Amino acid sequence: MRTISIILPFFKYKHYFKECLQNLAQSTFKDFELIVVLDHPTEDIDDLLEEYNSIFDMRIYTLPEGVTGVAACRNVGIQQAKGAYLYFLDSDDYVLEDTLQNMIKAMDHDVDMVNGVLNHTWNNKANYLHKVENKEVDEEDQEEREQRRLNKLSDFVSFASYEKDEQQAQANFYTMDNRRGIRTFTVLGNLYNRDFVVRNNFKFNENFRYYSDMTFMCPLLEKLNTSLRVEDAIYVKRKHNDPINEPALSQEENDNRFNERCDAVEYTRTLLKEEGVVRFCLDRKIVSYFVSKMSKRIRRSQDDLWRTDYFERIAKTIDGIRPEVMNRYKRNSKKMVACLQNRDLKGVQSCVRRKLGIKKFFRVFKNKNVLFKLAYYHIYSKKPIQDNVILFETFMAKNYSDSPKYIYEYIAKNYPGKYKCVWALNDGHEVPYGAEVVKRFSFKYAYYLAVSKYFVFNVRQPLWYRKREGQVFVETWHGTPLKRLVFDQEEVTSASPKYKQQFYRQRQEWDYLVSANPFSTKTFRSCFMYEGKMLEYGYPRNDILYWPNKDEIAKDLRKKLGIPEDKKTILYAPTWRDDEHYGKGEYKFTLALDLKLMMEKLSDEYVVLLRTHHYIADNIDTTGLEGFVYNLSKYDDISEIYLISDICITDYSSVFFDFANLKRPVLFYTYDIEKYKNQLRGFYIDMNTEVPGPLLYTSEEVVDAILNIDQINEEYKERYEEFYKRFCCYDDGNASKHIAEEVFK
């Protein structure tokens, strides 16, 4: 007989299931049977089951027709289990290597349940461990740590009712209250004595799709004699970073969720002692849900169900709570619940209004920057839209550049006086042709977000912006995609784990999206899930590369920057790495290219123009490289820099798509390509066979390629021409004109 029976239901998302099995195979504890219960899967997983059947002691069961749900799968697992202990594992989650081993050691204390640590993540195991190493804690896990810090308890717990031992019951209450895995009544992350489960006939109610855990866990907690907390037994609960296309069960949007929650609470109450600790905690859970979540919907939601049917439904559920549950709530929350029990809708709304008002006051008190948002929502958004106002923004107002710059200048020159143009810019930038400049996230900025008719942005709009009827949003984006974007990414390792969810809402506000080539059109449709109008005219920022006076512009810029006339120029433009960041929109960067070696070998003929991505927060130290390295990372317009560059070196930045319009040499310094390709983004094209230049892995190879640049040009001549036809086919110097004529009619 195996020691542990791991019960693993599977319904869908094969790639998550594969990672779950891969991680389980790395467990240091091997004495377990794996019971896989199939819930009529929609994907073919026979290959996975065959592969891991040779690794695990695996038994596979399928739910009968007409039976479905994780509750039914787990009940089958319990019935078929032969191990001394039970462990529930969801197919999109994973455990760390020593988790099971550490739990088994704890079972030597002859307890009925070992309670492990339940951590949350949006990432696969490798990226989760990377974040743990860098002390980046999920916000849900941070909340639990704070709760446990405030209430330190003994590891051993004996659950008792008030009738038996009031003091012990009070201690048990704090234990349940501060261990989230228990407090939320999830079965995950715990190891159960199978004899204890079978003897008491604990089962999951199969009528509940979303909230069956409490129907198993609450009766179990009430019967539990002893349990032990093990801090180094970690279960990782994975939140899906694409809740639009691949929602986890907890992320599914279903009209029935609300009623099921109430039904599950009411059913579970019937299984519990009315005066017991578990019943107390269950009641407090539903009250907290009403006070913190549902009450706001009663006031704010546009769906009247929250003020009619749902209001009555939650009131019926709250009617069953014990009076002492309310003792720990503040006065306004107590009044809110009392109003609910009296079916006083206006009273509840008044309490919510007071609660939100106090919350806003403290938000403003702590951070006065929220004031402009309040002004946006409550004042500016009520003003009429001004039909002649256009708001421009590039790279979160960091500079005056990119496609919005060229669209603006075309409008300013060709429609003088017709439009009031406003630029969002920080750091005191000046804009030609008389545009008004406002600072991003200022009152003026909020005002123009509310009243402008047109918007021309090259990145996403602020999350707090809400497009009004009649407004027109032009998204130019900022490059042909090499790296996989948004919904084409399996793993999101950037600073915002809700990236896909946020992007999905933001892209719904775009009326136009600019495309530089047919490849971009197809890719944007996929990665942005964009169904709106495409402006297939090329990038306005590339217009300058076709202007008849481009050589004069280049000559003037070289003189302005102090670049010697007798030196050729090498543009080095690296991008950022998703997993190396300080915070939202601020990325770390360590310069891997040996500029000192380049100076030693190339300075007689070349100088280097260093231009890092606008997301990179680090300032690159070029001490000792004066006269050879010109750091142009703060120079606004990279399109102008292209004009003075004889060679471009990049990695995974999209700059080479634009630079190729000049048909000048491109080198790729891809020292970390395997990590970038396999762990981070992945690519849309094969860099080994499709990019217009060689992949180089060391600084020495880069130097050698530059010294032999004529040979490189000849070697990649045909590939470069194919690349140019494929990716530069829309650019002709007139993109700004075409876009202005179509949008600003």
List where the protein language model places each region:
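Short, acidic, metal-binding catalytic loop of nucleotide-sugar glycosyltransferases
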Residues: 22-31
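Glycine-rich, basic loop-to-helix element that forms the pyrophosphate-binding segment
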Residues: 64-81
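Short aromatic/hydrophobic "clamp" motif used to bind/position activated sugar donors
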Residues: 86
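Donor-binding/catalytic cores of nucleotide-activated saccharide
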Residues: 94-231, 235-256
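Membrane-interface aromatic/basic loop that binds lipid-linked glycans or pyrophosphate carriers
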Residues: 299-383, 391, 409, 413
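A nucleotide-sugar donor-handling region in carbohydrate enzymes
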Residues: 373, 482-582, 719
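Conserved catalytic-core segment of nucleotide-activated headgroup transferases in glycan assembly
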Residues: 399-413, 527, 540-622, 696
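Catalytic binding pocket for nucleotide-activated donors in carbohydrate/polymer assembly enzymes
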Residues: 654-727
